[in-house]
A protein has these predicted regions:
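Active-site acidic/histidine proton-transfer and metal-coordination neighborhood
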Residues: 82-83, 87-176
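Active-site-proximal loop/turn and secondary-structure-junction residues that shape catalytic pockets
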Residues: 34-36, 63, 89-91, 110-114, ...
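Histidine-acidic metal/acid-base catalytic patches
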Residues: 20-28, 40-50, 131-134, 138-140, ...
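Active-site-adjacent beta->alpha loops and helix N-cap segments on the catalytic face
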Residues: 65-72, 154
Length: 269
């Protein structure tokens, strides 16, 4: 009887943890810098995110934002936000991470090299990542292989490259950042793809999902498939980070995030 009660309690706790990652203050805001129609600066952006109740940010950038890197870090600290992830990598940012003692995930697209066999492609893709694998290890940062289409965006290939780096380069800090807006080809087999990737997932970014990616970027709750896909995520026991997007150049980031927060809440009810 005691053993049965213990198993039930463990299951209940696991379910609670999986649900907690959908709480507003656990969600990661993504694609909120260059895509913001209002072109906010660091202080305005941090204040807006805090006002929305979001506390984690994955920072994407363009060349014009390099001079703002440190101010972005300082404003996040001031407003109680977690600098959760950083796009691609930049030595000035790495210097600042060391200075301010922060360790965000680094997200980088996995390339799609040509080779004569699947094994050779996996090895070649891993090879292209090695400088960043080493640099992130030195910084104490996790490295997320990011799906952005092509061979390198396929769940099975992301997993294979992760496994290769873990086995041959002792790179246990490498995982997967999977984006639904680059994953329309896996709507039909989402449960299988999620099961493959789950042990390696560092973040899972949500999006409204229609057949044929029409449109590619869509608010949560307005698509045909994201409710079913989110249900699968919750049932899988995945308890890691969940991201929501702006990614719409013509829209105020605050509005885009609000729409996704509202859509997500309707799905979760």
């Amino acid at each position: 009887m005691k053993k049965l009660l213990f198993i039930l309690l463990i299951g209940l706790c696991a379910g609670t943890n999986a649900a907690d990652n959908f709480a507003k203050d656990k969600l990661v805001a993504w694609c909120v810098v260059p895509f913001d129609a209002k072109q906010r600066g660091p202080a305005e952006r941090a204040a807006m995110l805090k006002q929305l109740g979001l506390k984690r940010v994955a920072y994407d950038w363009r060349t014009q934002h390099v001079k703002e890197f440190e101010e972005e870090i300082l404003q996040y600290k001031k407003h109680g936000l977690e600098f959760f992830a950083f796009w691609k990598g930049h030595e000035e940012a790495f210097r600042l991470f060391e200075k301010h003692k922060i360790h965000p995930q680094i997200w980088r697209t996995l390339r799609s090299p040509q080779a004569d066999s699947q094994e050779a492609r996996v090895a070649a893709a891993a090879q292209t990542m090695l400088p960043l694998v080493q640099r992130t290890k030195e910084l104490g940062c996790k490295l997320g292989l990011y799906n952005h289409g092509g061979w390198g965006g396929e769940p099975a290939n992301l997993v294979a490259v992760c496994q290769y780096l873990h086995k041959h380069h002792n790179a246990k800090h490498v995982g997967i950042v999977y984006n639904l807006h680059h994953g329309h080809g896996h709507i039909a087999d989402w449960e299988k793809s999620l099961r493959q990737m789950k042990p390696y997932l560092l973040c899972l970014n949500l999006n409204g999902m229609n057949d044929g990616a029409e449109p590619k970027i869509l608010q949560l709750g307005r698509g045909q498939h994201e409710a079913t896909m989110i249900t699968a995520i919750r049932k899988s026991g995945y308890a890691g980070p969940i991201g929501i997007l702006d990614h719409r150049n013509d829209t105020d980031t605050e509005i885009a995030l609000k729409e996704n927060l509202e859509g997500l809440q309707k799905i979760l009810k």
